[in-house]
Design a protein with these regions (language model features):
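Active-site rim helix/loop that mediates acceptor-substrate recognition in acyltransferases
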Residues: 20-31, 145-171
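Conserved active-site alpha-helix within GNAT-family acetyltransferase domains
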Residues: 91-104, 207, 230-248
């Protein structure tokens, strides 16, 4: 097992077919992270963000990768750090459940494909009487949920998000009532994270602010990404209305003590 040098990240990027957005963020060095491989052929790969989010890819028979995961999991338990492992492969799911089952719980999620034509032909919403503005430091300081700690967790720092990410918020007077931000972003992809004040739900705010996010993506030739838990029917429904189709199930394993 060895750590892939940043000089070889472009080779790794060509190797992977489909992966979570944070993988591309690591490979493009938008966020801090590491890439491990079982050997120089890159048959099995492990991606790690600084905050403890992982993605496993390739040949699931690699003993080196599963051993590395076990060591990282043990370290997270001892040091009370985050351990969240993404897997798009049933073979890897089986391997992880066999080897790490005592220490992790499994959550199933959907990732979607974005259909630009479906989005352009969607049922348009009436304009809402709320101010929509791009998120900057002032909005973060007065946020609904996505505060400095959030950006430190996923972006390494608020300044990195402000430089390389983007987001929007809706305001009712001086109060922020909905936010949509890129939890992860690369040159090609931007994964959306949305929150709406519970007092303003059912008004179509999530769809409205998501449209602002998607429009900004399309303006900059970026593909928007939408994921949700399989039992989050509200998010599934909103995504479907916005052109996110072809749901594909994947697994997220998290440390048993985390939830």
């Amino acid at each position: 097992m060895f750590k892939v040098t940043t000089e070889n990240y472009s080779i790794v990027k060509e190797t992977i077919e489909r992966a979570p957005t944070f993988v591309y963020s690591i490979l493009e060095q938008v966020i801090e992270g590491a890439v491990y491989a079982d050997n120089e052929s890159l048959h099995s790969l492990l991606f790690q963000t600084k905050s403890g989010i992982y993605y496993v890819y390739g040949d699931s028979s690699s003993e080196q990768v599963i051993s590395k995961l076990a060591a990282l999991l043990q370290e997270s338990i001892e040091q009370n750090k985050r351990f969240t492992l993404f897997s798009y492969s049933e073979d890897w799911n089986t391997k992880i459940e066999q080897r790490l089952n005592v220490y992790v719980n499994k959550l199933e999620r959907y990732t979607f494909s974005f259909d630009k034509n479906a989005y352009n032909n969607r049922e348009k919403h009436e304009s809402l009487n709320y101010e929509c503005i791009k998120i900057k430091q002032h909005q973060i300081d007065h946020c609904l949920e996505f505060n400095n700690q959030y950006y430190e967790e996923y972006w390494g720092s608020t300044s990195n998000f402000l430089e390389n990410g983007f987001g929007f918020c809706l305001k009712h007077g001086d109060k922020i009532i909905s936010e949509a931000v890129s939890i992860f972003k690369s040159q090609q992809f931007a994964e959306i994270d949305i929150v709406t004040d519970s007092n303003y739900r059912g008004l179509g705010l999530a769809s409205f602010i998501a449209e602002k996010f998607i429009d900004d993506c399309l303006l900059n030739d970026i593909k928007p990404c939408w994921d949700c838990d399989i039992d989050n029917h509200g998010s599934y429904h909103v995504g479907a209305k916005l052109g996110f189709t072809n749901p594909v199930k994947y697994a997220v394993f998290y440390k048993s003590t985390d939830r």
